[in-house]
């Protein structure tokens, strides 16, 4: 058999290697070019880009990287890989978009990696999560073991009691003071290896398209391949107390506002135990009944007011809400003040016939001489009709929600009824004109083991950073003015939204404030007393363990809603969550 020149054999193989994109010098560039051509066709294909999973990273390690056999398994077989709630799902653009695969499982983190060319970012494009996304607890009903016959009989015997407890819980949840339920909100933030800088975004887990805005640096236009890397996860958020104020204690009274009314007995009634029948006999609303059911053997002080009041106009700000304000005082005995003890909260109970519906409690202070002073405010131009009737109820209690040092108005405004966004609106209480960069200080503190996160609503000519608000501190917001003529905030202008994160967290040395397009997240491991290697996600100076994030459940389209225990913020039917990337100026 004749010998073949090895050089000829190598020359014959090189063209095939170049066509296949493997081996040799420049193979990576050829592979990236081929991927970019496929990606360009995918992005231009109507209407959306479907993503497939290529990596499933568990808390113990990597299950597979480029193994297509895992992707071709049935959904039931895939569950054994992704059934654990402590997993990371990685989505890329490597697979054919015409055959989107169904992914099932519960994950705490979804990572998205796309390799693009700079010119492909000029036009907006969409990213479709083809599998319905739902937020729910990891220990849902679908993962519990089947009940035995004895357990089923016991459950049936207690079913009426459970219905009654469920109804009572529903009534409590409808009342603001008992609404301590956690909710979930989706967070999208760039990974540390991302070249594209999308803005830090929070949005409800609802079906539909959510806009992600991004900045394209001039340096990126000179790169051959641009990496877009996103982390998608769900934060636990909780609504702060809005209708109750903590009782503040001060040594001396310094104010120019005089007391419009000084109360004495029998307007003051001290109840060591709260009689529900007596309280609800003259209740102002159904909410009062729900509030009274939460009373234990806690000492309660009730201040009854039915008088003609004098009103003073205030512009709102440090002193409290805007509107007409009246100050009322009451002298407490030394025994009564001591019996109340610490952690006392006050709330108004209105009379529907003789109380303005917008009457709120704006300040509550007990001085060292035993004088209790409180302000009531109504936002109107004319004084309410006389007399005004309401009750101030003071009670010692333990709250499980963040609360403010003073009335949240006019700085923090609750969202409109039925609004999809759960965040408080942060507004300017007065007209403000800025010529240069400025730091706004909002004179409110909040208390509790939570983190406040301010997400700005940027206006033309100025920008504000995303800011983490720590407990027991003022909220300080930096405003960067880019317009030469300065910027003007009209009164009640929207600055942004405020969220309170209830996920367990630890503070690290990261920056607590950054521009929206500069916020990045990092996935790292940390040794704790409970786990030798616990995976955590760090963002904006805070680290959160993956197990403390709200689980995200990816269910197949045929999955019925009753098959899984979901929270309030779930996707309706089987509509997917869509992310649209728009590149340009933020």
From Swiss-Prot:
Q: Which InterPro entries match?
A: Herpes_UL84
Q: Where is this motif: Nuclear localization signal?
A: 161-170
Comp. bias (Basic and acidic residues): 155-170
Specify the superkingdom.
Viruses
Q: Name one Pfam family in it.
A: Cytomega_UL84
| One of the record's GO cellular component terms | host cell cytoplasm
Location of motif Nuclear export signal 2 (NES 2) in this chain is 359-366
Localization recorded for this chain is: Host nucleus; Host cytoplasm
**UniProt key word Acetylation:** no
Q: Composition bias, kind Basic residues: at what positions?
A: 10-19, 32-41
Q: What UniProt keywords are attached to this protein's entry? A: Host cytoplasm, Host nucleus
Please indicate the residue ranges that the annotation assigns to the motif Nuclear export signal 1 (NES 1).
228-237
Where mainly located? host cell
Chain segments carrying region Disordered: 1-47, 136-183
Purpose = Plays an essential role in viral DNA replication. May participate in the DNA replication initiation by interacting with the origin of lytic replication, oriLyt and subsequently recruiting other viral/cellular factors. Additionally, interacts with and shuttles IRS1 viral mRNA from the host nucleus to the cytoplasm.
The record's family statement is: Belongs to the HHV-5 UL84 protein family.
- Quaternary structure note: Interacts with the DNA polymerase accessory subunit UL44. Interacts with HCMV major transcription-activating enzyme IE2. Interacts with host HNRNPK.
Q: What is this protein called?
A: Protein UL84
């Amino acid at each position: 058999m004749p010998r073949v020149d090895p050089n000829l054999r190598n020359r014959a193989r090189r063209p095939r290697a170049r066509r296949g994109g493997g081996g040799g010098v420049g193979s990576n560039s050829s592979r990236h070019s081929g991927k970019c051509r496929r990606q360009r066709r995918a992005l231009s294909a109507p209407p959306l880009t479907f993503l497939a999973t290529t990596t499933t990273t568990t808390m113990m390690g990597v299950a597979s990287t480029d193994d297509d056999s895992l992707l071709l398994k049935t959904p039931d077989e895939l569950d054994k890989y992704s059934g654990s709630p402590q997993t990371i799902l990685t989505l890329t653009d490597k697979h054919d978009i015409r055959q989107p695969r169904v992914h099932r499982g519960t994950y705490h983190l979804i990572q998205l990696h796309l390799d693009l060319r700079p010119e492909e970012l000029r036009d907006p494009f969409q990213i479709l999560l083809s599998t319905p996304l739902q937020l729910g607890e990891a220990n849902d009903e679908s993962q519990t073991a089947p009940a035995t016959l004895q357990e089923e009989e016991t459950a049936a015997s207690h079913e009426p009691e459970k219905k009654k407890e469920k109804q009572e819980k529903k009534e409590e949840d409808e009342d603001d003071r008992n609404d301590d339920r956690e909710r979930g909100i989706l967070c999208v933030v760039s990974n540390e290896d991302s070249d594209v800088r999308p803005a830090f975004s929070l949005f409800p887990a609802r079906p539909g398209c959510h806009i992600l805005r991004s900045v394209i640096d001039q340096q990126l236009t000179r790169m051959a391949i641009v990496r877009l890397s996103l982390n998608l996860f769900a934060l636990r958020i909780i609504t702060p107390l809005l209708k109750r104020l903590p009782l503040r204690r001060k040594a001396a009274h310094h104010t120019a506002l005089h007391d419009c009314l000084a109360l004495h007995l029998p307007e003051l009634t001290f109840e060591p135990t709260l009689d529900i029948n007596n309280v609800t006999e003259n209740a102002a609303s159904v909410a009062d009944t729900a509030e009274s059911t939460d009373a234990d053997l806690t000492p309660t002080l009730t201040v009854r007011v039915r008088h003609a009041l004098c009103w003073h106009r205030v512009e709102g700000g440090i002193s409290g809400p805007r509107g007409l304000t009246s100050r009322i005082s009451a002298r407490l005995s030394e025994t009564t003040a001591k019996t109340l003890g610490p952690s006392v909260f006050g709330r108004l109970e209105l009379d529907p016939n003789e109380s303005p519906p917008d009457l709120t409690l704006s300040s509550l202070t007990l001085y060292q001489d035993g004088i209790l002073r409180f302000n009531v405010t109504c936002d109107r131009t004319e004084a309410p009709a006389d007399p005004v009737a309401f009750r101030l109820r003071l009670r010692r209690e333990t709250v499980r929600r963040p609360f403010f040092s003073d009335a949240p108005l006019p700085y923090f405004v609750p969202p409109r009824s039925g609004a999809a966004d759960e965040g408080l609106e942060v507004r300017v209480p007065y007209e403000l004109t800025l010529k240069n960069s400025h730091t706004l200080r909002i004179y409110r503190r909040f208390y509790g083991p939570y983190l406040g996160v301010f997400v700005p609503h940027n206006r033309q000519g100025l920008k504000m950073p995303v800011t983490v608000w720590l407990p027991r501190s003022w909220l300080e917001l930096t405003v960067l003015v880019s317009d030469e003529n300065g910027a003007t905030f009209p009164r009640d202008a929207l600055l942004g939204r405020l969220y309170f994160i209830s996920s367990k967290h630890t503070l690290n040395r990261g920056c607590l404030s950054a521009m929206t397009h500069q916020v990045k997240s990092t996935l790292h491991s940390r040794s704790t007393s409970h786990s030798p290697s616990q995976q955590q996600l760090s963002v904006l100076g805070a680290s959160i363990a993956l197990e403390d994030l709200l689980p995200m459940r990816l269910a197949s389209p045929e999955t019925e809603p009753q098959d899984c225990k979901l929270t309030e913020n779930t996707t309706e039917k089987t509509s997917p969550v869509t992310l649209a990337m728009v590149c340009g100026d933020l």
